[in-house]
Amino acid sequence: MIDRPLEGKVAFITGAARGLGRAHAVRLAADGANIIAVDICEQIASVPYPLSTADDLAATVELVEDAGGGIVARQGDVRDRASLSVALQAGLDEFGRLDIVVANAGIAMMQAGDDGWRDVIDVNLTGVFHTVQVAIPTLIEQGTGGSIVLISSAAGLVGIGSSDPGSLGYAAAKHGVVGLMRAYANHLAPQNIRVNSVHPCGVDTPMINNEFFQQWLTTADMDAPHNLGNALPVELVQPTDIANAVAWLASEEARYVTGVTLPVDAGFVNKR
């Protein structure tokens, strides 16, 4: 096994300041990649739990460097394609190429009403679209292929959630990511660019570990234990579990894997 299978590669990761995005950045850096990290680092009004901060992004920079990777980190909003383009270009200016895209940025909506629907669609679906769109020209121009990984959710494969517009929007967005993945996988295959999606169950991150999410579990109009229980005896998986899957999809070990929905969910989807 190669110790640093992504040596010389460059990965563009959104939502990289903490949680899953940080785990992806650190794991890919440990595997040899340089990182272009983007995160909004400010609050969205309809999101009830605290989002990332500039200090969180700075901590990711330190962790990536400790793992042996170079990193360019910028604040940017996936809802704003221009800000993503600026962030990506800063990384390209530094590292000279792009090989891996991880469209990870996302928010969880609980009882946020119609504003929640709009914001979760804008971040979790349109933001993924923007991320891929700004990266495609460079990947194609280089002519060396690439790997695009879209972070969806177990909620993108089965129908779960409450009847609140924010929760419905989350399910709709995560299902929509699957459609994007499948279409991109076909469109980009001739350029040897692979596109896949990863579908976590609940992950031990600030998105889940906050008082607002726990309150939502107790008040949502659904059978929470039935709908949110995993098959394997674990309540929450770790960010590194998801990052391991992303690292594999980014590597040559998955060189002929494209168009795949990959659950990393402790059997959550299969139990439905």
Curated annotation (Swiss-Prot):
Residues at which substrate binds: S153
Gene Ontology molecular function: oxidoreductase activity, acting on the CH-OH group of donors, NAD or NADP as acceptor
SUPFAM superfamilies cross-referenced by the UniProt entry: NAD(P)-binding Rossmann-fold domains
Pfam families the record matches: adh_short_C2
Keywords, sorted A to Z: NAD, Oxidoreductase
EC number: 1.-.-.-
Domain of life: Bacteria
Main enzyme class: oxidoreductase
Catalytic residues identified in the record: Y170
Stored Gene3D superfamilies: NAD(P)-binding Rossmann-like Domain
Binding site residues for NAD(+): 12-34, 39-40, 77-78, 104, 174, 203-205
UniProt family annotation: Belongs to the short-chain dehydrogenases/reductases (SDR) family.
PANTHER family from the UniProt entry: 3-OXOACYL-[ACYL-CARRIER-PROTEIN] REDUCTASE (PTHR42760:SF133), SHORT-CHAIN DEHYDROGENASES/REDUCTASES FAMILY MEMBER (PTHR42760)
Protein name: Uncharacterized oxidoreductase MT2820
